[in-house]
A protein has these predicted regions:
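Carbohydrate transferase catalytic cores enriched for Leloir-type hexosyltransferases
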Residues: 1-174
């Protein structure tokens, strides 16, 4: 989905999804698509996985990111009924899509559990941690980027270990 590409021009999560889409598209009968209208993300500027426009790349103003995110979220919600897809893999933890995907498999990637382990240091991330928990329990599969993250997911969120795949080297070009 659009989330991280609305928020990041550069960054680890957007790079992860860029590389993941690039590698998945090399597999026969596999196609990825990110429903974006506006993004200034560097990694997807040369990809055919989205049909977006840069949004005032040289201008910064209050609310710019929120505006991009709102437009992209509305676009994604409108497209749910128009696209054929087999798996939904959101780029971040906003669960806005849960009432739209029906019984389609949901895969999420959890990078770490820092906000949950040290919540007193990240009070502004309480919403993100809450959403991560909701999605982890709804997900068909969870990708963890390390064994340590997997153990934290099991201990902190109470997720069955069989639901979690550790993929430390998912990205070839990273």
């Amino acid at each position: 989905d659009h989330q991280v590409f609305s928020l990041q021009n550069y960054g680890g999560v957007s790079r992860y999804f860029y590389e993941l889409c690039k590698e998945l598209n090399k597999i026969n009968d596999t196609e990825t698509y990110i429903p974006l209208v506006l993004s200034n993300n560097h990694y997807i500027s040369d990809m055919s996985i989205t049909n977006h426009t840069e949004f005032m790349p040289n201008k910064n103003f209050r609310g710019k990111t929120r505006l991009k995110n709102t437009i992209n979220r509305l676009n994604t919600q409108l497209r749910f009924n128009k696209f054929e897809y087999n798996v939904f893999h959101p780029t971040y933890y906003d669960p806005y899509f849960l009432n739209k995907i029906g019984d389609k498999p949901l895969v999420i990637t959890i990078y770490d559990m820092i906000h949950e382990k040290f919540s007193e240091m990240f009070p502004s991330q309480e919403y993100s941690a809450k959403n991560k928990k909701i999605l982890a329990h709804k997900a068909s599969k969870i990708i963890a980027i390390s064994e340590s993250t997997k153990q934290d997911i099991i201990e902190i969120l109470g997720i069955d270990e069989n639901k979690i795949n550790v993929t430390t080297e998912i990205i070839v070009g990273f």
